[in-house]
Regions:
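Short coil/turn segments at beta-strand junctions that form active-site/ligand-binding loops
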Residues: 1, 39, 93-94, 206-208
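N-terminal anchoring/stem segment of glycosyltransferases
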Residues: 1-72, 247-284
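Short, solvent-exposed loop/turn segments at secondary-structure junctions
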Residues: 9-12, 48-51, 102-104, 124-127, ...
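Conserved glycosyltransferase catalytic-site signature
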Residues: 22-26, 81-85, 102, 190-195
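Short, hydrophobic beta-strand segments that form beta-sheet elements in well-ordered domains
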Residues: 40-47, 94-99, 118-119
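A conserved donor-nucleotide-binding helix/loop in the catalytic core
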Residues: 69-98, 105-106
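Conserved donor-nucleotide/metal-binding helix-loop-beta segment in metal-dependent transferases, i.e.
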Residues: 104-141
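Catalytic core and acceptor-binding pocket of nucleotide-sugar-dependent glycosyltransferases
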Residues: 148-247
Length: 284
């Protein structure tokens, strides 16, 4: 099984590499490798990120480091996750795509049904995602009856390479059109990345399950009802699986009950790398 991480410095600025994101990346790969040593782990990155990883001395954690092949002229400040789709567009085998802040604490592969697609969780996106009546969405060359049910892609298992490439290429095409239409914010990114994936899974009659069997309400910004099409409800998932996502902002700012020093201490204890030198990193 091939497992993929993608890390691109879209700002082309070494100063944006921070300590929290660094230890999360290390924890993500180390925990996965500990629990799934039989898998092939590949990191795709740009040249600046490669130098950053070299300075940290952590490139050995992956089985292979590959260069991201940019295919589209996109507004990367809005479509900052486009490199994940560019990587997926080149895959010729079943893959798992891991976000760099997704931690899998225990073995999980034995729970994955290999003929089904898996996402992190299902999202209820009414009032949050751009709709079919959005003036930019209306101008897309790809026409669909857009529903507001979406998926979170911080963990993806994609068993069908043909479907994976079709999804990734269409997503990139939509991002390119949105760029030409001057899409103003990253709501259009998640439309092209997450809402599109849910739409295509339904269109192609693909079976899909989630890791977390609790709906996320995007508008209310809270977890909702549980369902029976996943591995664990949110309250049970935390000892097995965690995606930090927007939580990172609160940790860095010591807000909403989060504490940066406490979280860093726990993560550093998790990765067990006393030789790690992050003194050159300027940001939390």
């Amino acid at each position: 099984m091939k497992v993929i991480w993608v890390l691109e410095n879209v700002q082309d600025d070494e100063k944006v590499f921070g300590k929290l994101n660094t230890v999360l990346l290390i924890a993500s790969i180390k925990l996965w490798k500990k629990n799934h040593p039989e898998t092939t782990c590949v990191l795709y990155c740009d040249e600046l990120t490669d130098r950053y990883l070299t300075r940290l001395g952590i490139k050995y954690l992956w089985d292979s480091i590959e260069r991201i092949n940019r295919k589209k002229d996109l507004n990367r400040s809005v479509f900052w996750a486009a490199s994940k789709l560019e990587v997926l567009s080149e895959q010729n085998e079943p893959v798992i795509l891991m976000d760099n802040d997704t931690l899998v604490y225990k073995p999980i592969l034995h729970l994955i049904e290999r003929d089904k697609h898996y996402v992190c969780n299902f999202e209820q996106g009414q009032g949050y995602y751009p709709t079919g009546l959005d003036p930019l969405v209306e101008q897309l060359s790809y026409k669909a009856r857009w529903k507001m049910e979406s998926v979170n892609v911080s963990f993806l298992y994609l068993p069908d390479p043909e479907f994976t490439r079709m999804y990734a290429n269409l997503s990139l095409d939509i991002m390119e059109e949105f760029t030409r239409l001057n899409a103003p914010h990253s709501q259009y990114l998640i439309f092209a990345e997450q809402l599109l994936l849910r739409h295509l899974l339904e269109r192609e009659n693909k079976q899909v399950k989630s890791i977390i069997s609790t709906y996320w309400n995007c508008q209310k910004w809270e977890w909702g009802e549980n369902h029976n099409n996943g591995l664990w409800p949110i309250h049970e998932s935390q000892t097995n699986f965690k995606h930090y996502g927007p939580l990172k902002v609160w940790i860095i700012k010591d807000q909403a009950g989060e504490n940066y020093d406490r979280e860093m201490e726990e993560l550093i204890n998790c990765i067990q790398m006393p030789e790690l030198d992050m003194s050159f990193l300027l940001c939390r």
